Amino acid sequence: DYESYHIRLIAKLIGYEFPKGITAHQHLADLYGTDYETAKKITFTYLYGGLDDNARKIPFFQKVEGYVRELYKKFIISGRLTTPLYKREIHFSKIEGATEQKVFNYLLQALETEVNYMKIPKVLDFLSDKKSKMVLYTYDAFLIDTHPSERDEILGHLPTIMEEGGFPVRAYEGTNYNNLVVID
């Protein structure tokens, strides 16, 4: 599971660096003066619902706001949105009712897909000679059905692959998807 995946993708886009040794959500929680769970809700409200005066005082959101405005301006002028990694072009007509926020969301979803698209072959290559298999991919997590004899090797190597590019991960385990617990 990627830690604060959307937030970290956005940080890459805008050139913002989160402090080392702390999650992105905790960093923002400290700036808001709230607990972690409340901060997550606040952050996503700001990112997908717009900024208020409090958010505009936070350097991360100042950069986000500038980036979103510039992205939208380029989109309106060029008539297309170009994805960051694969340079795919999404034509104006494909984004119905385009707003600053909607165009940004399209870009962010495209970026998460492109980053994962680059990581999946590396994960599959690592697992190719193993009994363990990747059985599910979501936007911010890969589910590996891990053979017990390979657990330590998987935990020792897979996070390195997943964290390439500066995206920290947390590993969970359990007998099924509904009872996963974090591995410390």
What is the meaning of each model-derived region?
Residues 2-100:
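Helical catalytic core of nucleic-acid polymerases
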Residues 2-6, 112, 148:
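Short, flexible loop/turn elements at secondary-structure junctions
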Residues 96-117:
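Short glycine-/aliphatic-rich beta-strand segments at the starts of folded cytosolic domains
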Residues 115-138, 142:
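Active-site palm subdomain of RNA-directed nucleic acid polymerases
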Residues 148-184:
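Polymerase palm active-site segment centered on the conserved acidic dipeptide of motif C
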